[in-house]
From Swiss-Prot:
It is an enzyme of class 4 (lyase). It comes from Halothiobacillus neapolitanus (strain ATCC 23641 / c2) (Thiobacillus neapolitanus). The record marks K329 as: Transition state stabilizer. Its cofactor is Mg(2+). This is Ribulose bisphosphate carboxylase. Induction: Form II RuBisCO is expressed in the presence of form I, when grown in air with or without 5% CO(2), although it is not the major activity. When the form I gene is disrupted the RuBisCO form II activity increases, but is not found in carboxysomes (at protein level).
Length: 459
């Protein structure tokens, strides 16, 4: 059934829809299956994503038609399809009238992903009007709170050198806490790796007090504050809160130095919102493990990493992993810096839409995945700043001297870039950075050919 007369209006202008402020706009890359017209398939897609089905129903009235999603732009050659969703379509909380991301996702990326006449459809950008921004929580804490704890300026406080305890699984409580202490002697921030929680060989109630003891000893020894991101992910929200409450009790007077890590992609929006609302005084660390199944450029369905990061800010993530923009081991490219710009700025241009955030707090880009001191100067040059959290596991624990030296080498890499210095020349005056060349020789060969002769390592 051709529903384009009802669910498509190509006379609508995008600028008018944005100015009206009553629609969430979604840009897809969509391809119909063979034998289906592009406009017809687009209209069916909009119908299935809002008020319609595959047949006319007798219960539809004029009000219902007033909240139809409308296709307002198509370009079959580029597979571009854009749909305007009226704000009134989306579910609101009974308790406070606020919007919920599960409702948004259910419509814009729900049943339409399994339609018989659609070959594939993937969201590449989404626009939220001011009213929608107001109806989501947004972050309660941001990187400025981390800088304050670390004793830095709360504007442009710079690079936060972090790590992930490695190996990711298999350490018992005492070795785990010892690994944390070794890094904190040089670094700022440690996160649980996403599988770490309450394994039988490393019970949470045994390991966490030891980690806090490591933090206190490192703080006493260095005279500097330290930060820990604790994984509270669980199937059950009450289990999440039990873990979080134990963390706050354990860290006591240092509870402000405790962030909560949530596996938001596998756990779902409810897990992020629970953490955001129940613990507004903690930095909410959004880990996105599993996202690649839909965000990968090779995937034709779902949504992109850009869209994932954007909706994480709406939900209230203080920070989210954004990959390494082609400088680490994960999928990515230099243009992924636009992901960071979208979540850290008050307004930014996306692939399709220019988004204003109307004062919503920023979400920190968290950089991880195969990074070390040698890769960082190029990364910072591409991004244009160093106001990020970087969790370098191998880049710290793989340093030839010690995890603390690995942490120091990361900080020195930032200072090298910030000073505009030549990394080889900078290494001659900074031992830990220089030893990173010997620690990661394959990277050194690829990024800095001839480094052995220049640093005298061949002698």
């Amino acid at each position: 059934m051709d529903q384009s007369a009802r669910y498509a209006d190509l006379s609508l202008k995008e600028e008018d829809l944005i100015a009206g402020g009553k629609h969430i706009l979604v840009a897809y890359k969509m391809k119909p299956k063979a034998g289906h017209g592009y406009l017809e398939a687009s209209a069916h897609f909009a119908a299935e994503s809002s008020t319609g089905t595959n047949v006319e129903v007798s219960t539809t009235d004029d009000f219902t038609k007033g909240v139809d999603a409308l296709v307002y732009y198509i370009d079959e050659a580029t597979e571009d399809m854009r749909i305007a969703y009226p704000m009134d379509l989306f579910d609101r909380n009974v308790t406070d009238g606020r919007m919920m991301l599960v409702s948004v996702l259910t419509l814009i990326i729900g049943n339409n992903q399994g339609m018989g006449d659609i070959e594939h459809a993937k969201i590449h950008d989404i626009y939220f009007p001011e009213r929608a921004i107001q109806l989501f929580d947004g972050p309660s804490k941001d990187i400025s709170d981390m800088w304050r704890i670390l004793g830095r300026p709360i504007e442009n406080g710079g690079y936060i050198a972090g790590t992930i305890i490695k190996p990711k699984l298999g350490l018992r409580p005492e070795p785990f806490a010892a690994a944390a202490y070794q890094f904190w002697l040089g670094g700022d921030f440690i996160k649980n790796d996403e599988p770490q929680g309450n394994q039988v060989f490393c019970p949470l109630k045994k390991v966490l007090p030891l980690v806090y003891d490591s933090m206190k000893r490192a703080q006493d020894e260095t005279g500097q504050a330290k930060l820990f991101s604790m994984n509270i992910t669980a199937d059950d929200h009450y289990e999440m809160m039990a873990r979080a409450d134990f963390g706050l009790e354990t860290f006591g007077p240092d509870a402000d130095k405790l962030a909560f890590l949530v596996d938001g992609f596998v756990g779902g929006p409810g897990m992020i919102t629970t953490a955001r609302r129940q613990y507004p005084n903690q930095y909410l660390h959004y880990h996105r493990a599993g996202h690649g199944m839909i965000t990968s450029p090779s995937a034709k369905r779902g949504y992109t990493a850009f869209v994932l990061a954007k909706i994480s800010r709406l939900q209230g993530a203080s920070g989210i992993h954004v990959g390494t923009m082609g400088y680490g081991k994960m999928e990515g490219e230099g243009d992924d810096r636009n992901i960071a710009y979208m979540i850290e700025r008050d307004e930014a241009q996306g692939p399709v839409y220019f988004q204003k955030w109307y004062g919503m707090k920023p979400t920190t880009p968290i950089i991880s995945g195969g990074m070390n001191a040698l890769r960082l100067p190029g990364f910072f040059e591409n991004l244009g700043h160093g106001n990020v959290i970087n969790t370098a596991g191998g880049g710290s624990y793989g340093h030839i001297d010690s995890p603390a030296a690995g942490a120091i080498s990361l900080k020195q890499a930032y200072e090298c870039w910030k000073a505009g210095a030549d990394p080889i020349e900078f290494a001659k005056e900074h031992k830990e950075f220089a030893r990173a060349f010997e620690s990661f020789p394959k990277d050194a060969d690829a990024i800095f050919p001839g480094w052995r002769e220049k640093l005298g390592v061949h002698k």
